[in-house]
């Protein structure tokens, strides 16, 4: 977030050492004021956050933190339940978040392109990197049909299948040949994901954002609570949110759950792990650690991680792709239970991404 983060005195109290150096990842953060707020909520209940003493502290302190939040707005807040968007995978069903979140839907489209008719598994090894780039390009183009609030279905499998008519195994497809052509979108990468599940298979995949790194960079005095930035002024980070779960409704089993972060590259990262774990039967740790590539439609560039294999690079270059290496492509947290939960919880594997400082922990109860 840079040095500008420490223009706020409350932020300096939390995230700087006594000598003025910033706390780094992996070091302990002490938030006594936030702990006090959480204790109040445990004693008085969640309602105190919206209409009680915590609400008054937030509303009163927001202006001091250069924010705008009234107690009337807190009282009027209501969570909104929305049905998930789903699609079939064999006998199972994927569920992901509906618009305005677009990351899970785009990852689902990338995955469907590869799974349909065993397209990825049947492709020669030397063609697979090219195939991944091409289906990613088409998935990002297809979302132009619905991402701006148009009435088109967000995950139309027939429409996706039709987009493969222009695919050539030996040559990159120009984005101008896709309908609609993809657009370049600046997406805020400030988000994170987490997954939690119990031995009964009850599972939540969650993706959240403060619309900017550390939100506004301002802490409400006396609370330890960071104010979120406005999506209208700093870019809609909700676009890239990418939670997904895979279940079998007939047998009431959970098989896979994941979430990714990383802005525009989040869907490609998630789809990469889904493909490796669910199509290639790769152990989850290997699936999450494996090198990734990303094509966001526009600009017409394939982004790869530094450890891409030479033969994959040559395959892309030979087919006319412009290739650029970047330090990392997204971060994924995932749980994979090949035997299903609650039926075979001992088959579950859980993994956080080596590209970040996440945590994966659990066991059989």
Protein language model regions, located:
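Noncatalytic scaffold domains of N-terminal-nucleophile
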Residues: 1-45, 49-51, 55-98, 102, ...
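Short loop/turn motifs at secondary-structure junctions and domain boundaries
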Residues: 6-7, 77-78, 184-189, 236-237
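Internal maturation/activation junctions in enzymes
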Residues: 16, 116-209, 223, 322
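Alpha-helical support elements that line or immediately flank enzyme active sites
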Residues: 44-51, 56, 259-282
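Active-site rim segments in enzyme catalytic domains, especially the processed small/beta chain
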Residues: 68-70, 197-256, 263-267, 280
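Short, small/polar residue-rich loop motifs at catalytic or cofactor-binding pockets
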Residues: 81, 188-191, 213, 239-241
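Extended C-terminal subregions enriched in glycine
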Residues: 129, 140, 145, 149-152, ...
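C-terminal catalytic or substrate-handling cores of phosphate/nucleotide-
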Residues: 270-274, 296-365
